[in-house]
């Protein structure tokens, strides 16, 4: 059981560690100390739920549904381009945009909406949690699947809270206007690069 837990933990960690929309948003909220723990919690809960769905039968369904993959992929492309544009505006028009961003992210429900968007409109999340982890965990016996799921979900919890708290710890430096411009420039590049990759994948799916 312990070995299955450890297997789930490290496989999940390998999926989560590469910087993507979820990690970028949690880091950004941590640098501003605005709902950063809530952001980490919701990301971890979402990942845990999707991992469970994949391990207990959802992997085959998503793999076979071309229409669902198309919907998630192009929805993700549109959102990532929009989010990247918002980050670029902070870089180009720092004073005005930072003031607007600071006001908008103080709205709890707006933050919740963005968290769900970077999670549920990100096809990589589905591929990592449901398809990859789900297919591996789904091959285990019924008594070991909960341990694999618990281990994988624990990695998600550990990572998102560590990232959030670390960013909050360095908030005095990261919250400065120059730092925010650098962070947002980095986020813009990440979002648009992922959107470009997803668009290429979407065209392949349509074929």
From Swiss-Prot:
Residues passing through the membrane, by range: 1-21, 42-62, 67-87, 111-131, 150-170, 185-205
Catalysed conversion reaction: L-arginine(in) = L-arginine(out)
InterPro entries linked: Arg_export_ArgO_enterobac, LeuE-type
Protein name: Arginine exporter protein ArgO
Any Pfam family the entry gives: LysE
Membrane-related topology note: Multi-pass membrane protein
GO cellular component, one term: plasma membrane
PANTHER family listed in its UniProt record: ARGININE EXPORTER PROTEIN ARGO, ARGININE EXPORTER PROTEIN ARGO-RELATED
Family classification: Belongs to the LysE/ArgO transporter (TC 2.A.75) family.
GN (gene name): argO
Keywords, alphabetical: Amino-acid transport, Cell inner membrane, Cell membrane, Membrane, Transmembrane, Transmembrane helix, Transport
GO MF annotation list: L-arginine transmembrane transporter activity
Localization per Swiss-Prot or TrEMBL: Cell inner membrane
Function field: Involved in the export of arginine. Important to control the intracellular level of arginine and the correct balance between arginine and lysine.
């Amino acid at each position: 059981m312990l070995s299955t837990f450890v297997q789930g933990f490290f496989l999940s960690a390998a999926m989560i560690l590469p910087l993507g929309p979820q990690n970028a948003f949690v880091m950004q909220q941590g640098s501003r100390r605005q709902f950063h723990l809530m952001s980490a919690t919701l990301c971890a809960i979402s990942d845990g739920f999707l991992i469970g769905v994949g391990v207990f039968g959802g992997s085959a369904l998503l793999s076979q549904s071309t229409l669902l993959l198309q919907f998630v992929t192009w929805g993700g492309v549109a959102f990532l381009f929009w989010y990247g544009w918002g980050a670029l505006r902070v870089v180009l028009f720092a004073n005005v945009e930072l003031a607007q961003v600071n006001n908008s992210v103080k709205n709890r429900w707006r933050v919740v909406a963005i968290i769900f968007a970077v999670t549920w409109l990100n096809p990589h999340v589905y591929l990592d949690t449901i398809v990859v982890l789900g297919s591996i965990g789904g091959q285990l016996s019924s008594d070991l699947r909960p341990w694999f799921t618990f281990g994988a979900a624990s990695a998600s919890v550990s990572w998102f809270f560590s990232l959030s708290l670390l960013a909050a710890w360095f908030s005095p430096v990261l919250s400065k206007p120059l730092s925010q411009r650098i962070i947002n420039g980095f986020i813009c590049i990440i979002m648009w690069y992922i959107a470009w990759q997803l668009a290429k994948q979407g065209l392949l799916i349509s074929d």
